[in-house]
Amino acid sequence: MQTADIRNAWLTYFGDRGHTVVPSASLVSDDPTLLFTVAGMVPFVPYLTGVVPAPFARATSVQKCIRTLDIEEVGRTPRHGTFFQMNGNFSFGDYFKEQAIAYAWELLTTSEADGGLGFSPDDLWVTVYHEDDEARQAWKRIAGLPDERIQGLGRDTNYWHTGQPGPAGPCSEIFFDRGPAYGADGGPATDDDRYVEIWNLVFMQYLRGAGTGKSDFEILGDLPTRNIDTGMGLERVAFIKQGVENMYETDQVRPVLDRAAELSGRRYGADHEDDVRMRIVADHVRSSVMLMSDGVRPSNEGRGYILRRLMRRTVRAMRLMGVDAATFGELFPASRDAMKAAYPEVSDDFDRISRLAYAEEETFLRTLSGGTTILDVAVGETKAKGGERIAGDTAFLLHDTFGFPIDLTLEMAEENGLTVDREAFDRLMLEQRTRAKADAKSKKTALADLTVYSEFRAAGETRFTGYDELETGTTILGLIVGGHSVDHAVAGDIAEVILPETSLYAESGGQEADAGSIVGQGFDLEVLDVQKPVKGLISHRVQVRSGEVGVGDAATTIVDADWRRGATQAHSGTHLVHAALRQVLGQDAHQSGSYNRAGYMRLDFAWNQALSPATRSEIEDIANGAVRDDLQVVTRVMPIDEAKQLGAMALFGEKYGDTVRVVDIGGPWSRELCAGTHVSSSAQIGLINVVGESSVGSTNRRIESLVGREAFQDLAVERAIVSQLTSSLKTPREQLPDRIADLLQNLKTAERRIADFEAQALQQRVPTLLAQGSRVGSVTLIQESLGSVRSADEVRQLVTLVRERAGSDPVVVALAGDAGGKPTVIVATNQAARDAGAKAGQLARAAAAVLGGGGGGKDDLAQGGGSDVSAIGEALAAVRQALDS
């Protein structure tokens, strides 16, 4: 059976039995605690846990999933993959254990011709929780399985829970026996290579208490409703039904594997390590295509980092098979063609996917070339010293300078039989992050643990009234202090406030949260932040300015009108700039991110080259033309399919429900799906002033603008600057560019003359320094403190000049200088000195130790530095001593 046949058989079977067929959710999960959708049940968690009432009693889906926890196993086992599809059937308080078992057995053992999967009953084994006699008896009664093919196992394998207090229950797993060629007899409890798990039935019926580990917890009682959550791995069933050895050889994955074999000239099946690499390529390319089709872009954090890691592991695998050139142009289309029938968005969006992928590959090929050289040197030096571990500072250098992710360094070290000093690397990373954040001040702090919100979300969604009003009367539904639900908060407390309705906008869609207050009889709360910690619930982080607030108190939410006005100007301005971008650059220049706050907007868009000043001006002029035209802004709520038919733009990476809000500016001039707040006519924006355009990675650009009052203020400042320049330079405004260009040219000419003079001055010092050489053993040492110097480069130039003029006898040159309060010692050796055993790197480190710093370099040229300028004389003495030892 082809993968599509298995998928269709599943959906048809359960659809015919009253299950609502639910399309796959995005790989980007709604759950803020998850980077990705990691299991088929993830989109149904709110229904299974009772936080949100289920809109159906039964459901079925084929859910696309991403898991990278076992990424090191990919390619090495028959069933580990980072992307997989999970067939699931779910019951929300409807049928339970016996019916779930009956459905599973019928679908598995019914012939393919009759709509089933055609498994022989003799090849199937099951496991149950050892205390779940109900499930054991159901299997015997329904399937006729003998006791020896129903194995009872413990909580660690056959009991489902989330890892924290909440829903739990026993589970029953179904296994396929691949036969004695794959392992020992004895069932799943004996050998999980021979016996492959294909389906897991979870009977969610109990409430578990606190505990640790997989099995150390208490069962508190029964759940109000009993639910069913099952999952069948589509790829696992496919490789069994297609008679191949592993999931990488199935019809949806094999085309990429075959293309990798063709590109590398290696034959699949001829060499184990090459086979592993081809399987890695096949898996990771498919995962990358699917992630990018759901809006994920390569980056250095979060989801984007996972995608980048998958793509870079692919490049590495191809290089290890001898392919140094770019290959994504061949591999990605192979995956697209294999997946587009099940997921048309892969094909529809492939132009964008391929551009991103090819740019990422080219960037990493350059990174790999430079970083590999550094790592090869480190490997050689480590082995030469008899070491087993690459230094943490080397790994940090690779990460910080060459963009090498630490996991790649770890892999390459392991390939050379070495490890990495991860503790030192992590320490350096922490120091870097601490420095980066030292001056950052933010009003945001972490929200409470997500579990505290479940009771509030169960009461219903927070209704946002801020589209129509700035003040809303409401009631305090809940208070959270220090991560715990409380009944009151007093002056000075920082708390989260949960309300049934609010006029305060929660940060989302690139728009910053509203500023404002929440007031009531006897209390005044300053709103610091507004967020959506879980879907449908708004939390207001506040400081109690005065009084005491309690649960049940009447309250009024008040939005800062000036703040909201500026935010709406910025958000509507973003839509205009986006539309103008696409008019000028074409439809490929779509938005990839945005940020709006009062008076400021930032728009990231897909583009791989800088915009010329003329293009920037054209975009700004078009956007301001729309402002002057006073276009009406109309918002409508409608089904998403209707919105797409109208041409409303859905932004990549955003997640939308069945019903969406469409924002029109001037009818079709700008039409986007958007839940943000907006002006009622474009003239209210006032002015858009583009103030910057820059790169955000290799495939994105960023355009920044001031909007409204801030834009006018910025123009006033520019006007004042121009007036000052015309006065200072005694030049009319229209002639300023030429006048400034002349001044800059004169400055460059003067700088060149100064540089020539300094070079001559350095040359004149060489004879004096050569005459000061003294013997240290078999080597002549020339050393001197130069006093104050402009930079370390000046010292380096002079050291190099002296070495070149020193002749062929063994010579070491060590010169020091004070570069703005930073002592520098630079050491150079000629070939004869190196033959005599003198190494510049060792000598520079000896000097640096005295200066209170560090140093190093190559045997022919090295540098040391520190913080103690007064110790320069001692540092030069240390060079002599090290040379003499």
Curated annotation (Swiss-Prot):
Its localization reads:
Cytoplasm
Q: Name one GO cellular component term.
A: cytosol
Q: Which GO terms describe its biological process?
A: alanyl-tRNA aminoacylation
The UniProt keywords, alphabetically, are:
Aminoacyl-tRNA synthetase, ATP-binding, Cytoplasm, Ligase, Metal-binding, Nucleotide-binding, Protein biosynthesis, RNA-binding, tRNA-binding, Zinc
**Known catalysed reaction(s)?**
tRNA(Ala) + L-alanine + ATP = L-alanyl-tRNA(Ala) + AMP + diphosphate
EC supergroup of this enzyme = ligase
> What EC number(s) has UniProt assigned to this enzyme?
6.1.1.7
Q: Out of the domains of life, which is the source?
A: Bacteria
| Its biological purpose | Catalyzes the attachment of alanine to tRNA(Ala) in a two-step reaction: alanine is first activated by ATP to form Ala-AMP and then transferred to the acceptor end of tRNA(Ala). Also edits incorrectly charged Ser-tRNA(Ala) and Gly-tRNA(Ala) via its editing domain.
The name of this protein is Alanine--tRNA ligase
Which organism encodes this protein?
Clavibacter sepedonicus
Lineage runs:
Bacteria, Bacillati, Actinomycetota, Actinomycetes, Micrococcales
Q: What is the name of the gene encoding this protein?
A: alaS
